[in-house]
Amino acid sequence: MILTTSRKPSQRTRSFARDLERTLNIPYVQRGKLSLKEIFEIDKHVLLIGEFKANPGTLVVYDVENEKRLSSFISVKLQREICGEKIYNDDGIRIKISRELKDNEEFQKYYEIYDEFLFQHLNINEDSDITLRLEKDPKYLFAIQFYKGRVKIGPLIRIKSIKLFDSLL
């Protein structure tokens, strides 16, 4: 899986992309003038960060092999806003679900979608220091928060809505 942004990302969107690159330990490709087709030739699974009013506003996961895409409207908090420093992840990531969400049937549908499109393509390592935790958020469907041990390191991604499409474009 690779990470990229819209064509001319704002500074905040670039910072968010770099935060995800460091915490998820996946390569970030600067888009420049590359078309989506050229990006799809680099990797079959692409995580694209789109913008809304110069902020990261959408998270689109492309599954090129199955010609599907998952689009989510998001709200974010950067690493520097949460812990004030850059945290690097050299190995995989551990995924945990909060207790409130484990029993929620509606959340299970969202989790299965995200697992198919995103989580299965990450480097999962149960012994990792870095944890991707899915948490309940009162205003949103759910939130994705990153921890190192028990300390929040960010970025925080709040998922507002999820849509599935049967075409890449």
Swiss-Prot record:
One GO MF term attached to the UniProt entry: rRNA binding
Keywords, ordered alphabetically: Ribosome biogenesis
Protein's GO biological process: rRNA processing
InterPro entries, A to Z: Brix, Brix_dom_Rbsml_bgen_prot
Brix domain span: 1-169
Protein's job: Probably involved in the biogenesis of the ribosome.
This protein's name: Probable Brix domain-containing ribosomal biogenesis protein
Organism phylogeny: Archaea, Methanobacteriati, Methanobacteriota, Methanomada group, Methanococci
